[in-house]
Amino acid sequence: MIQRYTMAAASAGAILTFALAVFASTTWSAWTGDVLIIGEYHDNAEHHLQQQNAVAAVQPKAVVFEMLTPEEAAQLTGVDRTPEAMVHATNGFHWSNIADYAGILAHSTVIIGAALPRDDMRAAFTSGAADTFGPQATRFGLTTPLAAAEQNTREAAQFDAHCAAMPREMMGGMVEAQRLRDATFARAMLDALDTYGAPVILITGNGHARTDWGVPVYLQSARPGLTVQSFGQGEAGVAPSGTFDTILTDAPAPEREDPCLAFSSEG
């Protein structure tokens, strides 16, 4: 079973609520372990700042990014570790707001990309995550079907996330694509651990960071005994959906348009 490290509340000055700890950014240097997963809302600048603070304080051997393909990450190998250089070097990359991660990239000694090609995502949608992942699918738990309750919950969440604009029966494929991404991020982290040593940090969305069905599940399946901690980041005192070892909620929420307006006949 994965061991989960919790920073001492006394040293962190933290308030413990429902066994979840809320920490200030100054406590990142107290963290020790093998793997640190830091979630985010992709458009929240304060979340990126927390991640930057974590990378600067922990000084991981490698940082895995959901937002980069392996090919894009390879292009950053010789780039000066300054935000300005990273903004320039990532211009034209596939992630639309990749420049927002320049500060995190600048503090990352080794940068690893884990984003999947669209063809792999389509394959998971049609043929399942296990077939697409390949020979290690059993090791990472992809050949084990989800419990019915979790499957239903996840399909409903995908339906809502897509603004009810896609047929409900397509959501099973969306869940498979999500499982493929989670397992792929986990594999990238284990490869980084084997190559560079601990600790390794993953920068990713909250949905992938959650401990009940995200990347930690696949790490546990593939390599029990890792010391892992997952941070979720909420906004304006509201926690993100799912379970995490630690939740940060003090970031303000940026102004956003309703993403479902594009699907509305009145929008």
Listing of model-derived features with the role each one plays in the protein:
Residues 44, 70-71, 209-212:
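Active-site environment of divalent metal-dependent phosphoester hydrolases
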Residues 46, 50, 70-75:
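Membrane-embedded segments
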Residues 34-38, 61, 198-204:
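Generic beta-sheet signal
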